[in-house]
């Protein structure tokens, strides 16, 4: 487990004070750098030792067959797996004739710092070779947020105490060996030497390698160039082969003298462009990087992040761990999305190969809501990517005998890649999640152009899907049968409340959008009768409720299922230790489902219903998904269980910084990183938008004395500053001088020239805090109990 001893809690950086080889893979994920197009895992500069080497290009993948013991109609035949592309991070250092390797000689000191404001990873190492020669190595790495195709590394070697001859080999390496993976289905499939050489060339101080995939027919280019500064004589040579290019720098250093190398990297890929065009694109990016220079790249990186933090920062007084974690999470969300530009945001970002690099409902459901308030330009690009796959989604729906569009449960380029349909294709709610993301973007930004550009078609086709999936019974009630909600331990059910409410929202949203764009809707074949049918279905959707228990049923009949024996089944996650045929017919819940419905469709439940539902479902949720803790934090906060909510917020925030699920090695959990913001801002800040108006109603737990957060709303920058007695709203620059929002159910008009301060609304819980299944209390509570 990652501990505070080696990773101290600091507000604006993640710092590793000593190197633990047993945690290399985890630290490589934490220290990953990305801009949404290029992703570099935080591997050591010298390439070895490593936990999992990784260099990724967004949506650059290979196709592999999906094997079935018993295949059926409609099963996807091929899967998609992210490819580890050409590694440009490597600097091999020889001191005399001995390679710098942290496993040999003496590592006198070692430190790595991820700077969340500078957008850089800095490493400082002091090493004594087996022969007694000492050097200090300092490297700083960045993936440019300002220049999409560019990464760069500054590598400095300093001689200590005596003269040393140093040799630095700066490399581009393709088809690296990757370690064996586990049988865990959440871990990536292995691809053996996935790239075929196309072309290679070299210059005096650089090289370029081009490769393509075999089955997906994607082509990529990776190039490097170097600047070298050193006192005295230096020899520089470059050679290139199909899978390896190397620039070698040899010099002698007296004590205190330094060799400084700046390595510029450029990456690009395409499924359409010619070899010369792709080669020239990479070469042009390299020239542009050298023109900017190392300092220019640093300055542009800082400026980009300064602007982001001005709209996104969250300050948490009283809880330094959550303070560090929420900034860490926001930083990685920005990295995953900033320059993705009409490509997917994978569930692991570009930090690892977990889940094969696929995007799920996590993107629209958890990541985009945060970015809509903090980096809306990235959301628009992510939604454009999803809309670009609409034709594939329509083909998938037709294959399944349905109308409209059926978006894939997991994918890289738009085709369904889930081999397990009960927890894949049957999770139809992803279509409504996508529709809600389009609607939230329109409401929060006030920008209707994206809906007109591509959102309307998505809303219409997803509405058509729901109408063909559902049916009215003889009493006129509308049902959805054979669906799976967010809880994957209760699959293929009737009338999952979350799915039905989200489908109803999708249907109403589509009808409303057609009224805003009548000519475009008519061109897509929408009639008045079709819109009326959408609204009829939405208004008649069945929402199961157990009158005797006074709670909503997660799905029809859920509260009558057998109770799960939590005392006898204590090895988690259950998906790796229990058969689905035992999980499906029992009241055991993988992750927030009905509870998530109360967050996303808050207006559909009364305060009393929320309190009783939280009390019932808390006792049955095991949180075998990283998506659950943030939602439980939000709803526990809303019903008044503030300390329990704080524990869930801690768990959501620290899932990767403390490796709470023991799988950070495979990449970071983007949705849970988003969940840190959600738990704090939506949970304790009381942010809601499901009724089309900005509503903020904060209430803080005892462990947080002050919560101050920034967000964007319809062109305004808003600062919310809450403590235990009052909340202050500061309206910044925007399209006008005033904004009407809602606080504690009452309209409040803010003015740009005057902060508004109002007393917080105190809430008393209707019920005492509920217990959790044995051994599944929030992580922080268990730690405090020891």
Swiss-Prot record:
Substrate binds at residues 361-362, 590-591. GO terms for biological process: carbohydrate metabolic process. Pfam families: Glyco_hydro_65C, Glyco_hydro_65m, Glyco_hydro_65N. The active site is at 488 (proton donor). Belongs to the glycosyl hydrolase 65 family. InterPro entries: 6-hairpin_glycosidase_sf (IPR008928), 6hp_glycosidase-like_sf (IPR012341), Gal_mutarotase_sf_dom (IPR011013), Glyco_hydro_65_C (IPR005194), Glyco_hydro_65_M (IPR005195), Glyco_hydro_65_N (IPR005196), Glyco_hydro_65_N_sf (IPR037018), Malt_Pase/Glycosyl_Hdrlase (IPR017045). One of its GO terms (cellular component) is plasma membrane. The keyword Hydrolase applies. This is Uncharacterized glycosyl hydrolase Rv3401. It is an enzyme of class 3 (hydrolase). Keywords: Glycosidase, Hydrolase. Gene3D superfamilies: 1.50.10.10, Glycoside hydrolase, family 65, N-terminal domain, Maltose phosphorylase, domain 3. Residues 762-786 are annotated as: Disordered. Its EC number is 3.2.1.-. Residues 766-776 have a biased composition (Pro residues). GO terms for molecular function: carbohydrate binding; glycosyltransferase activity; hydrolase activity, hydrolyzing O-glycosyl compounds.
């Amino acid at each position: 487990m990652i501990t505070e001893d080696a990773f101290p809690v600091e507000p604006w950086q993640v710092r590793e004070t000593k190197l633990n080889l047993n945690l290399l893979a985890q630290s490589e994920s934490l220290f990953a750098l990305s801009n949404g197009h290029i992703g570099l895992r935080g591997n050591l500069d010298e390439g070895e030792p490593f936990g999992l080497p990784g260099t990724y290009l967004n949506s650059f993948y290979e196709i592999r067959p999906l094997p079935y013991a018993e295949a059926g109609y409609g099963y996807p035949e091929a899967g998609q797996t992210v490819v580890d592309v050409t590694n440009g991070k490597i600097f091999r250092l020889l001191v005399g004739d001995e390679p710098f390797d942290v496993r040999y000689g003496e590592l006198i000191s070692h430190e790595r710092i991820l700077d969340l404001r500078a957008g850089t990873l800095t490493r400082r190492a002091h090493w004594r070779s087996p022969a007694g020669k000492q050097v200090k190595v300092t490297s700083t790495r960045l993936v440019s947020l300002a220049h999409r195709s560019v990464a760069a590394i500054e590598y400095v070697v300093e001689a200590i105490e005596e003269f040393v001859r140093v040799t630095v080999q700066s490399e581009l390496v393709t088809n690296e060996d990757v370690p064996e993976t586990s049988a865990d289905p959440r871990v990536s499939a292995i691809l053996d030497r996935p790239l075929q050489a196309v072309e290679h060339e070299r210059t005096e101080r650089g090289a370029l390698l081009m490769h393509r995939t075999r089955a997906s027919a994607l082509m990529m280019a990776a190039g490097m160039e170097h600047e070298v500064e050193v006192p005295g004589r230096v020899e520089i040579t470059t050679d290139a082969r199909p899978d390896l290019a190397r620039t070698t720098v040899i010099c002698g250093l007296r004590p205190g003298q330094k060799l400084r190398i700046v390595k510029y990297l450029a990456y690009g890929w395409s499924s359409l462009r010619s070899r010369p065009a792709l080669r020239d694109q990479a070469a042009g990016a390299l020239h542009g990087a050298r023109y900017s220079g190392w300092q220019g790249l640093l300055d542009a990186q800082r400026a980009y992040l300064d602007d982001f933090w001005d709209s996104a920062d969250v300050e948490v007084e009283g809880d330094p761990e959550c303070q560090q974690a929420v900034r860490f999470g926001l930083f990685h969300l920005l990295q995953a999305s900033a320059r993705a530009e009409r490509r997917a945001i994978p569930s692991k970002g570009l930090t690892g190969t977990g889940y094969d690099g696929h995007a799920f409902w996590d993107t629209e459901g958890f990541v985009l809501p945060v970015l809509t308030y903090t980096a809306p330009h990235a959301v628009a690009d992510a939604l454009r990517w999803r809309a670009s796959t609409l034709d594939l989604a329509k083909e998938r729906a037709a294959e399944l005998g349905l109308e409209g569009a059926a978006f894939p449960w997991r994918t890289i380029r738009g085709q369904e890649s889930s081999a397990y349909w009960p927890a894949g294709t049957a999770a139809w709610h992803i279509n409504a999640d996508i529709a809600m993301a389009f609607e939230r973007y329109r409401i929060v930004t006030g920008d209707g152009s994206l809906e007109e550009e591509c959102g309307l078609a998505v809303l219409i086709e997803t509405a058509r899907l729901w109408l063909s999936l559902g049916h009215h019974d003889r009493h006129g009630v509308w049902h959805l049968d054979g669906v799976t909600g967010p809880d994957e331990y209760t699959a293929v059910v009737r009338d999952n409340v979350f799915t039905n409410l989200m489908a109803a929202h999708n249907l109403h949203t589509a009808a409303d959008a057609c009224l805003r764009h009548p000519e475009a809707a008519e061109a897509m074949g929408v009639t008045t009768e079709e819109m009326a049918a959408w609204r009829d279905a939405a208004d008649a959707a069945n929402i199961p409720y157990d009158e005797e228990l006074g709670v909503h049923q997660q799905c029809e009949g859920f509260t009558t299922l057998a109770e799960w024996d939590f005392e006898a089944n204590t090895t988690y996650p259950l998906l790796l230790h229990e058969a689905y045929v035992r999980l499906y017919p029992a009241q055991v819940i993988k992750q927030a489902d009905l509870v998530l419905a109360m967050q996303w469709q808050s207006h559909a439940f009364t305060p009393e219903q929320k309190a009783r539902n939280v009390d019932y479902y808390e006792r049955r949720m095991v949180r075998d998904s990283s998506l659950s803790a943030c939602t439980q934090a939000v709803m526990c906060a809303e019903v008044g269980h503030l300390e329990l909510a704080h524990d869930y917020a801690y768990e959501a925030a620290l899932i990767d910084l403390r490796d709470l699920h023991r799988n950070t090695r495979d990449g970071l959990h983007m949705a849970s990183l988003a969940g840190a913001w959600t738990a704090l801002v939506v949970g304790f800040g009381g942010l809601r938008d499901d009724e089309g108006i900005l509503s903020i109603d904060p209430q803080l737990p005892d462990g947080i004395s002050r919560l101050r957060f920034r967000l964007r709303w319809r062109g305004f920058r808003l600062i919310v500053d809450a403590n235990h007695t009052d909340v202050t709203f500061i309206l910044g620059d925007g399209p006008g001088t005033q904004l009407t929002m809602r606080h504690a159910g009452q309209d409040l008009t803010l003015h740009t020239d005057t902060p508004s301060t109002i007393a917080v609304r105190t809430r008393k819980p209707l019920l005492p805090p509920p217990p959790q299944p044995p051994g599944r209390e929030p992580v922080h509570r268990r730690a405090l109990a020891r």
